[in-house]
């Protein structure tokens, strides 16, 4: 037998799903046979007579065999003689109307029929309770959240046993949909506390709802607590990622790094967004080489696109990791994909640091040829330095003279020009002395 399933909640959205049960599973234990054989004795109710029982059993069989219209027709025939039926028999008739409409996914008619069941006074208390609770579930599935709460409160007013976790969860879901998060969180917390006290594992969708409620209440610390429990109990990739995000949001960068790194090692981080996030977290925490490695592997695996931006990220991370040599191929790949010369400029600067002056001069010239530079003066400075170290003093002076035209690098260029001119004279003097 299928059962009505509790509505599920996601991080930022709430959706309810209703799996339609078979004709007689909505209200547990109530079939024509059970109603006839085991009438509730907690209150005086009239008997379900054999004649009515057989007619209801026929309608039930027709519906169970898949002929809902024939089942409804049989019930219509019974309804024509309702004046001769007692309250319990009428209630059972509407009960089966409700079942058939429910199986036909006609929730409004099902609700109307079940409301007629509980409107009859002389019915067993068990039928009254189960039907009222089912009405709350149906109202929830039908999107009538105020009515859901009203039915739950009606059920609570006649229920003499401890409230069930299903009561608190359904009420919490309705309040969530109504955006009354304070009442919603109180109810879901009660359901979870009750399960904890009984030594039971809270259902996963309860924690999902609790997390969503705290998020809506702007209580990130509570969201973290719930997600920590979800990771421990259910170990799903999305919970690890969400917990990492919330650690970042609450300023717990070390915990964020630890949880995301662990998720990565378990193979939970597979999407482009998640791998980029891990790379950025590594970089933020001073683990630049790991940042570059994650991005490089993501590109190789085809998860992250081999774009200029991503290659440049790897290259800059390598620079931060003091792996200048390893940055070169990534800057080169980035440069191949764009029309501007910014990445050739970075190549020139890295080559200078590596004392590869021929390559630095070539890269600087390529950057100037492509153009589109934000700081053109820096390229002329790099070119001037490369030419100086190659002892191309005149070319060096020309490059620094171009840099001098830019206010940003004017003073530095002037100093270099003076220095290069002195070195040129010194080199000429030395050559003359050696002749």
Which residues does each PLM region occupy?
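Solenoid-like repeat scaffolds
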Residues: 41-48, 79-86, 118-124, 153-161, ...
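Generic helix N-cap/helix-start motif at coil->alpha-helix transitions
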Residues: 48-57, 86-94, 124-134, 160-170, ...
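Alpha-helical adaptor scaffolds
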Residues: 308-322, 329-377
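N-terminal leader/linker segments that initiate helical-solenoid repeat arrays
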Residues: 2-14, 19-115, 126-130, 141, ...
